[in-house]
Amino acid sequence: MSEMTPREIVKELDRFIIGQKKAKRAVAIALRNRWRRMKLNKELRYEITPKNILMIGPTGVGKTEIARRLAKLAKAPFIKVEATKFTEIGYVGKEVDSIIRDLTDSAIKMIKSTAIKKNKKRAKELAEERILDVLVPTIKNNWKKTNTNNNSEATLQIFRKKLREGTLDDKEIEINVAVTPMGIEIMAPPGMEELTNQLQSLFQNLTGNKRNIKKLKIKDAMKLLIEEEAAKLINLEELKKEAIYAVEQHGIVFIDEIDKICRNHGSSGPDISREGVQRDLLPLIEGCTVSTKHGMVKTDHILFIASGAFQVSTPSDLIPELQGRLPIRVELQALTINDFELILTEPKASVTMQYQALLKTEKVKINFTKEGIRHIAEAAWKVNESMENIGARRLHTVLERLMEDISFHASDHRNEITITIDEKYVQKHLDKLISNEDLSRFIL
């Protein structure tokens, strides 16, 4: 779990996301409160439930990006889901309980990965011994044939040294390794996910103990054996307990596109993927127990962050019970020309930097002038204003069009060349297209 302060979290998010201070502060406080809660005594800790967040803002302003970056910062079980993928219980489609099952699976992977790294040193020693067991008997057979009386321990140490130095990396050996269980996909009706998981585990166990002899180079065999030995050192029961605890106490669920499950005022009849889904989400957000293949998971202290554009609906169109379970509301602002300008230059691995790095592989050096950047930002903003506002995603469309010729002809140059993207270059390639609204609708 992350021990970063709210200020440090916001600073880290600032490296990748421009603006949206309120949203960054809200998620930073929520993340820090997880850490604060764990410092309390057990009785009080149980009483403090997370304050779930609802992020409201137009498309392309950074809602999903905040979730992506938060996942890396949290160092806790995290899952991002689309609200539109779920249907009401009893209908064909994914049930909301699968969110917690997927979150638990991700926690298992995360903790298993940490355990493997922790055991890597010991696993490497065991893998080394297994490879030496294959190499040394061959030497012993040769000793018998030649009737020489060399010290076997000294020979073993020589081979150990060679193995560690990498001089034997390309030598081929035969090793006995476990067969990877074959994944079996089972289609099951809604509500039968638990049975499906049990059947999949059963089929995997049938092949799980099988072993196979493989002929591999020592460097490849070492990697395979380290993984196998590290997995053997893990206590699976302890791993499951740790994963369930991590999900229950530190788990974060990000529900995107929640505005798409608001009731459509113009329609009649059952709304199996709208209001029904909202009602199914209620117990999950409020706190219930979900059955997973790893054990029972309580959702009382899982943090839920929902987001939506709410262009054709408002948060008040959500059912009142769900509104009450998302008490913190954060409104994200539409992006301005200045924001676009900063997005093109400020973030780590910005879009312009990506193009420069890609074309550098073809010996094409791209220089963006301040005026050129400003004109690109203005072009993207104008297209957003005259048509659908898709936020920062418009920059990708505009830049792709601007860089099309350069990208196509980049491999034609034998020597290194430099191309400057200034205001004139941008005007030449974009202005006519932007002024022709019919064309820009299809191209930009």
Curated annotation (Swiss-Prot):
InterPro entries to which the protein is assigned, alphabetical: AAA+_ATPase, ATP-dep_Clp_protease_ClpX, ATPase_AAA_core, Clp_ATPase_C, HslU, P-loop_NTPase
An annotated GO BP: proteolysis involved in protein catabolic process
UniProt-annotated location(s): Cytoplasm
Residues binding ATP: 18, 60-65, 256, 321, 393
Keyword Nucleotide-binding found: yes
A cellular-component GO term for this protein: HslUV protease complex
Keyword Cytoplasm part of the UniProt annotation: yes
SUPFAM superfamilies: P-loop containing nucleoside triphosphate hydrolases
GO MF annotations, alphabetized: ATP binding; ATP hydrolysis activity; peptidase activity; proteasome-activating activity
Swiss-Prot/TrEMBL keywords: ATP-binding, Chaperone, Cytoplasm, Nucleotide-binding
Listed Gene3D superfamilies: 1.10.8.60, DNA helicase RuvA subunit, C-terminal domain (1.10.8.10), P-loop containing nucleotide triphosphate hydrolases (3.40.50.300)
HAMAP family: HslU
Complexes and interactors: A double ring-shaped homohexamer of HslV is capped on each side by a ring-shaped HslU homohexamer. The assembly of the HslU/HslV complex is dependent on binding of ATP.
Homology family: Belongs to the ClpX chaperone family. HslU subfamily.
Known function: ATPase subunit of a proteasome-like degradation complex; this subunit has chaperone activity. The binding of ATP and its subsequent hydrolysis by HslU are essential for unfolding of protein substrates subsequently hydrolyzed by HslV. HslU recognizes the N-terminal part of its protein substrates and unfolds these before they are guided to HslV for hydrolysis.
PANTHER family reported in the protein's UniProt record: ATP-DEPENDENT CLP PROTEASE ATP-BINDING SUBUNIT CLPX-LIKE, MITOCHONDRIAL-RELATED, ATP-DEPENDENT PROTEASE ATPASE SUBUNIT HSLU
Protein name (record): ATP-dependent protease ATPase subunit HslU
Organism: Buchnera aphidicola subsp. Baizongia pistaciae (strain Bp)
